[in-house]
C-alpha cells in the first residue's frame, strides 16, 4: 500500500498579468521516464485555451537541481524579509545616517 501517490502532473499558476492574457506556471511532469520542472509563460490561443510559450525554462528534477533551487528561493525570501524588517524598524536611522552633506542630490528615503 502506498502512503502517498504523487499526481502524474503537477501544475500551479504562479502569476497572471494585468489583462489576464498571460500566466507564469510551475509545472512538473515526466518525459521519457524522467521528471522535469518547468517555469514557463502561458498564453491563451484563439479558442481561449492556455498553451505553453517558448519563454521559460525546463530542468531535470534531481537532487542537485532541486537543492539548488530550494536554497535560492530560501535566500531570496530571507533577503526580502530582512529588508522589510530593516525598513520597518530602522528607516529613520538609515535615512538620517545616509543624508549627504553639502551636496545638491538626495538619497531617496525609505518609506514604511
Feature names for model-found ranges:
Residues 11-13, 22, 54-56:
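A general secondary-structure boundary signal
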Residues 12-15, 28, 43-44, 104, ...:
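Sequence-pattern detector for short linear motifs
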Residues 21, 36-37, 79, 105:
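General helical secondary-structure elements
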Residues 55-112:
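Mixed-charge, Lys/Arg-enriched low-complexity segments
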Residues 24-55:
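A short, structured beta-strand/loop element
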Residues 1-19:
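Negatively charged, low-complexity tracts enriched in Asp/Glu with abundant Ser/Thr
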Residues 18, 46, 61:
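Solvent-exposed, flexible loop/coil residues
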